[in-house]
């Protein structure tokens, strides 16, 4: 079983934490990760594209010219697809791009992604976040102290409201509640930062039959993951209300 050093926000070592083999020690399955990420990105598509067919385009009710005797080809409407201003033949219509992905495949993909980051030493564990007030400068200093470079995924718990507000303005940092941990966000960032609180929670989520967050991503923006981050979301809504005032 692999282990990782636990650091304080200032970068000092306070001990070590064991990484579960079934989460951070599996052989990465590239094809499964690809399929799950493809499904996640497909589920994010709005699918609202729409074109008008010949029957939906306004006008074109009168026959342009008589059927015979003009020497021209037969025409019944000016809204046929071959005409300028006519309808579109076989054009896109609104559709759902969501794909059904087995829960075991979702679980394997997330474990593969976390194992890949752990193998490269890109999983960092902090004992806890200590932000008295939200301050982005303190977040920048904390990332430098713990050695998080490049694109960083920071996984928060329910009570890390000030930390969430401190990190969320950084363009190279993606903030995520532990209940929303998913394959795409892990692979889309170079480093994954957990706290002692969120690390075991994350292991339990992956070890289950399937992660709730990734199942909801299949159905494109499910409310289930939002319910698990009520405290953080409520803090965001309070901020927006203050800005409007």
Short names for language-model regions:
Residues 1-46, 92-245:
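Extended polybasic, low-complexity segments that bind anionic RNA or targeting/receptor surfaces
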Residues 52-91:
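Glycine/serine-rich anion-binding loops at beta->alpha junctions
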Residues 47-51:
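A short, aromatic/hydrophobic, helix- or strand-capping loop or linear motif
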């Amino acid at each position: 079983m692999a282990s990782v050093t636990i650091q304080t926000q200032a970068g000092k070592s306070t001990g070590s934490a064991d990484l579960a083999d079934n989460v951070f020690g599996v052989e990465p399955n590239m094809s499964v990760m690809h399929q799950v990420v493809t499904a996640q990105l497909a589920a994010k598509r709005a699918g609202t594209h729409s074109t008008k067919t010949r029957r939906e385009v306004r006008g074109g009710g009168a026959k342009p010219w008589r059927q015979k005797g003009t020497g021209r080809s037969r025409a019944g409407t000016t809204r046929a697809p071959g005409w300028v201003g006519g309808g579109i033949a076989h054009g896109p219509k609104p559709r759902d791009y969501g794909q059904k992905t087995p829960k075991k495949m979702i679980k394997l993909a997330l474990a593969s992604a976390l194992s890949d980051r752990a193998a490269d030493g890109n999983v960092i564990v902090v004992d806890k976040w200590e932000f008295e007030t939200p301050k982005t400068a303190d977040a920048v200093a904390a990332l430098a102290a713990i050695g998080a470079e490049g694109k960083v995924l920071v996984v928060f718990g329910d009570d890390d409201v000030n930390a969430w507000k401190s990190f969320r303005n950084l363009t190279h940092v993606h903030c995520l509640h532990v209940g929303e941990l998913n394959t795409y966000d892990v692979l889309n960032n170079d480093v994954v930062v957990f706290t002692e609180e969120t690390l075991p929670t994350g292991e339990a989520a992956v070890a289950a039959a399937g992660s709730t967050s990734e199942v909801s991503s299949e159905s494109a923006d499910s409310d289930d993951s939002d319910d698990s981050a009520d405290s953080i979301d409520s803090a965001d809504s309070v901020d927006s209300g203050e800005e409007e005032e």
